[in-house]
Amino acid sequence: MTNRLVLSGTVCRTPLRKVSPSGIPHCQFVLEHRSVQEEAGFHRQAWCQMPVIVSGHENQAITHSITVGSSITVQGFISCYKAKNGLSKMVLHAEQIELIDSGD
């Protein structure tokens, strides 16, 4: 089964860094995406806020460069978890992160 998502956007919540009891570092933030997509011959505004989690030592170095307002592209897989309120929430598990040069 294929489960692959590539999403570009702007970090809209301060990254939260934690280390699990087993010593695995995690970084969580929310990525906001806005674009215009073509569907059935019409232009459509696309918008979402996607929770992202970066786990493991491999990508932690780049997470220290990520702040609110950073433009990034994230590649990974999506999964759901049950929130404290009992509702299912989708999250993007990042496997690759690329900072987008703002051109400044």
From Swiss-Prot:
Molecular function as annotated in GO: single-stranded DNA binding
Coiled coil location: none
Residue intervals of the SSB domain: 1-101
Transmembrane domains' residue ranges: none
Record carries keyword DNA-binding: yes
GO biological process terms, semicolon-separated: DNA replication, synthesis of primer
Quaternary structure annotation from Swiss-Prot or TrEMBL: Homodimer. Interacts with PriA and DnaT. Component of the replication restart primosome. Primosome assembly occurs via a 'hand-off' mechanism. PriA binds to replication forks, subsequently PriB then DnaT bind; DnaT then displaces ssDNA to generate the helicase loading substrate.
NCBIfam families: PriB_gamma
Name of this chain's protein: Replication restart protein PriB
Species this protein is from: Shigella dysenteriae serotype 1 (strain Sd197)
